[in-house]
UniProtKB/Swiss-Prot annotation:
Organism annotation: Methylorubrum extorquens (strain ATCC 14718 / DSM 1338 / JCM 2805 / NCIMB 9133 / AM1) (Methylobacterium extorquens)
SUPFAM superfamilies, alphabetized: Aminoacid dehydrogenase-like, N-terminal domain (SSF53223), NAD(P)-binding Rossmann-fold domains (SSF51735)
Compartments where located: Cytoplasm
Pathway where it operates: One-carbon metabolism; formaldehyde degradation; formate from formaldehyde (H(4)MPT route): step 2/5
The protein's name: NAD(P)-dependent methylenetetrahydromethanopterin dehydrogenase
Designated gene of the protein: mtdB
Secretion signal, residue range per the UniProt entry: none
Keyword flag Oxidoreductase: yes
Entries under InterPro entries matching the protein: Aminoacid_DH-like_N_sf, Methyl-teptahyd_DH_N, Methyl-teptahyd_DH_N_sf, NAD(P)-bd_dom_sf, NAD-bd_H4MPT_DH
Task of the protein: Catalyzes the dehydrogenation of methylene-H(4)MPT.
């Protein structure tokens, strides 16, 4: 059997050691990082990877796409797919900054909690997402909308930037995502007034919602925070929290390590799917979400 090779592409200066470790621990034998990769480089790199091996060894060859930009990663996936010349085809898996698997795990954990605690699901729920301009928020918003929720991005620097992001989501996925201002405490409280679910995907170590702020969310069922660095992004959610009652007594909280556990397993199993598949796979956050739901239970 041919050796398993993973070509790891990133537009950044360095490939993430996190992703390198995950791929090796999942079983890939040879990893080659390519840094500073531009969108225009993807076709030539992809075709070099496919034409240097026999067609039957395409399933032993993978292209991983990293970086920190969800839309650029998706565009790179599209370029790689278009560069294939059947039967010369490889696996492709995108997970920029771990956001595809983190966002998938976050929404999967919320879905699990909604079912376990409230006998409901994401459909029709209003999901308000802080850190709205970030990659994890992007993925969570798209997954939520695709699952039938009403997702809203909150911009820490105003409404304009998140509105543009929401517009590109509609263009790319055909979904409607809301956008609101979250610059001041009163704006953040107004944003969560009708929230069934609150997600915090803001910067590490930054408090976004206080216990007092949560009083403005009388309908709140589940809140999740992926910030693992004190202070918590959402007050009262410990990093290890799994369906822990929130300080207001309204709803339950899910912490960063609970989400991280599902994220870790999801990313590991995505790599293993590539190694075990008999046909080439193209994997993104939608595939990650299906797997994360299975893992979360």
């Amino acid at each position: 059997m041919a050796r398993s090779i993973l070509h790891m592409l990133t537009p950044l200066k360095h490939m993430s050691p996190f992703d390198v470790n995950m791929a090796i621990d999942a079983g890939f034998e040879t990893l080659i990082p390519y840094t500073g990769v531009d969108l225009t480089d993807v076709v030539s790199l992809t075709q070099d990877s496919i034409f240097s091996r026999a067609p039957q060894d395409g399933v032993r060859t993978g292209i991983f796409i990293g970086g920190k930009n969800a839309e650029l990663a998706l565009d790179m996936v599209d370029r790689a797919k278009k560069a294939f010349v059947p039967p010369f085809v490889n696996h492709v898996f995108a997970d920029p900054a771990g956001s595809f698997t983190t966002g998938a795990a976050m929404v999967a954990e919320v879905n699990r909690a909604l079912k376990a605690r409230f006998s409901t699901d994401l459909k029709g729920k209003r999901i308000v997402i802080f850190g709205g301009a970030g990659v994890v928020a992007y993925v969570a918003a798209v997954i939520g909308a695709l699952e039938g929720a009403q997702t809203v991005l909150v911009g820490h620097d105003g409404e304009e930037r998140v509105s543009k992001i929401a517009f590109t989501m509609k263009w790319r996925f055909g979904i409607d995502v809301g956008a609101v201002d979250g610059t001041l405490p009163e704006a953040r409280r107004a944003a969560i007034t009708d929230a069934d679910v609150i997600l915090s995907a803001g910067p590490a170590g930054v408090s976004i919602l206080t216990a007092e702020d949560l009083e403005s969310a009388p309908k709140l069922l589940v809140a999740s925070d992926v910030n693992a660095v004190p202070p918590a992004g959402i007050a009262g959610i410990d990093v290890n929290a799994v369906d822990v009652p929130l300080p207001t007594g309204k709803g339950v909280g899910i912490g960063a390590l609970a989400v991280g556990n599902v994220k870790y397993q999801t990313q590991c199993r995505m790599f293993r799917k590539m190694l075990e598949a008999q046909e080439p796979l193209c994997l993104d956050f939608r595939d990650a979400y299906k797997l994360a739901v299975e893992i979360a239970g």
